A protein has these predicted regions:
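Reductase modules of NAD(P)H-dependent flavoproteins
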Residues: 2-40, 232-335
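Transmembrane-helix exit/juxtamembrane "anchor" motif
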Residues: 37-57
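Ferredoxin-reductase
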Residues: 52-165, 239-241, 252, 267-271
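Histidine-anchored nucleotide/phosphate-binding helix
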Residues: 118, 209-226
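A short, basic/flexible loop-to-alpha-helix module at the beginning of a structural domain
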Residues: 168-195
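Short helix-loop-beta connector
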Residues: 193-198, 299-301
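Conserved beta-strand elements of the Class I
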Residues: 199-203, 304-306
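Gly/Ser/Thr-rich loops at beta-strand to alpha-helix junctions
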Residues: 206-211, 310-313
C-alpha cells in the first residue's frame, strides 16, 4: 500500500521540486485558499441539503395538498399521507402546534373545518406529511357522526386535495425539555416558559395521542442528536378497548428503543382478552397517575404533564385526580 501511495505522489513531488522557493510559497498560498474555499462551499451545500424547505404556513392562507397514500390502522382509523411540493419540502409546523383541515361539501358547497395534528416529523419526514384520522361514523348517540372525519374518509388517492391552515395553538415544544406558552392579552401577553428537563408525563384519550406522538418523536430525535432532556417520558393512554389503541406499535417501539427513558401504560374500558391484558382496566384514576406519571411529591419541580382527550375524561377523571395529587396548573399543558 505504501509503495502504491508513493507512486501516486511522485509526479506531485517532482513538480514541487521543479519550482523555485518563491514559486513554492505562491503555490502553497493558492492551495490553502483553494482548500478553505472548498471547505466553505461544502459546508454551505451540506446546510442547504440538511435544512428542508418549509411550506409557507402563515395561519391565514390555505395550503392545498394531494392525498398520496392511505394506511388502514383499525376498523375506524386511517393514516393519511399527503404529498408536499418536492421531496425536499417539510410541512413546516412547529412542534406542539396543529392545523385546521378544511373540506368542501360537494353537494351543498358548505365548508367544514376541524383541527388535526400531524404525526410525522419535519426533521425526519421530507416530501410528505402524515395524519392519523379516526372516522366517527353515525351511531345512536350521534346520528350524523363526525362530518369532517367522514369527508376525509371519502378522499381518494391521486384524485382529491385537502386544504390546510396553520400553524395554530399557543403551545410549542422548543427543545431540550422546554415548552413555551403564548399568554392571553388578559394575562398580560408575552410568552411563558415551562421547564420539563427532568420528566414529561403525557395523558391521552383516543385520538388525543396524535399531538403526543409528534412531541415524543421530536424529543427522541433530539436524543439521537446528543440531547439529554427530558430525562424521562411517561405516557398514560386511555381507550375504550385494546383494538381502539392508535399507533400502538409505534408507542411500544419507543419503549423498546429507549428502555428506562420511555414508559408507556395503557388503560381500557374493557379488555377483550383479560388473561393476556397486563395493563389497567377502567377510567383514568388518581392511583394510575400517581404510579405512572410525575408528581410534585416524587419528581420535584422540573416536569410537565401534557394532556389531550375528550372533555368528559378531563372533567370527571383527570382534573379531580390532579387536584388530589396537588398537581397545579403550572405543571399542566392541555391540547
Amino acid at each position: 500500500m505504501e509503495s502504491f501511495i508513493l507512486q501516486l505522489l511522485k509526479p506531485i513531488i517532482a513538480f514541487l521540486e521543479s519550482l523555485t522557493l518563491d514559486e513554492q510559497k505562491k503555490f502553497a498560498a493558492l492551495l490553502s485558499v483553494f482548500v478553505v474555499s472548498l471547505t466553505f462551499l461544502t459546508s454551505i451545500f451540506a446546510k442547504k441539503k440538511s435544512n428542508p424547505i418549509a411550506l409557507p404556513l402563515d395561519g391565514k392562507t390555505a395550503i392545498r395538498l394531494p392525498l398520496e397514500r392511505i394506511v388502514q390502522l383499525s376498523k375506524d382509523t386511517k393514516l393519511l399521507r399527503f404529498t408536499l411540493p418536492t421531496k425536499e419540502h417539510a410541512f413546516g409546523l412547529p412542534t406542539g402546534s396543529h392545523v385546521m383541515v378544511q373540506l368542501t361539501d360537494a353537494k351543498t358547497g358548505e365548508k367544514h373545518m376541524r383541527p388535526y395534528t400531524p404525526v410525522s416529523s419535519d426533521a425526519l419526514d421530507k416530501g410528505h406529511v402524515d395524519f392519523v384520522v379516526k372516522v366517527y361514523f353515525p351511531n345512536k348517540q350521534f346520528p350524523e357522526g363526525g362530518k369532517v372525519s367522514q369527508m376525509l374518509d371519502a378522499v381518494k388517492v391521486g384524485e382529491d386535495t385537502v386544504e390546510f391552515f396553520g400553524p395554530l395553538g399557543g403551545k410549542r415544544y422548543v427543545g431540550e425539555g422546554e415548552f413555551t406558552v403564548k399568554k392571553l392579552k388578559s394575562q398580560g401577553g408575552g410568552v411563558e416558559r415551562r421547564d420539563a428537563r427532568d420528566e414529561v408525563g403525557m395523558i391521552a384519550g383516543g385520538s388525543g395521542i396524535t399531538p403526543m406522538l409528534q412531541i415524543v418523536r421530536e424529543m427522541l430525535r433530539e436524543t439521537g442528536a446528543g440531547g439529554q432532556s427530558p430525562k424521562k417520558i411517561s405516557i398514560l393512554y386511555a381507550n375504550k378497548s385494546e383494538e381502539d389503541i392508535l399507533c400502538r406499535d409505534t408507542l411500544d417501539n419507543f419503549e423498546k428503543q429507549f428502555p428506562g427513558r420511555v414508559k408507556v401504560w395503557y388503560t381500557v374500558d374493557a379488555a377483550s382478552k383479560k388473561k393476556e391484558w397486563k395493563y389497567d382496566v377502567g377510567f383514568i384514576t388518581k392511583e394510575m397517575i400517581e404510579k405512572h406519571l410525575p408528581t410534585p411529591a416524587k419528581s420535584g419541580d422540573r416536569f410537565q404533564i401534557l394532556v389531550c382527550g375528550p372533555p368528559p375524561m378531563m372533567k370527571f377523571a383527570v382534573n379531580p385526580a390532579f387536584e388530589k395529587l396537588e398537581i397545579g396548573k403550572e405543571h399542566v399543558l392541555t391540547w
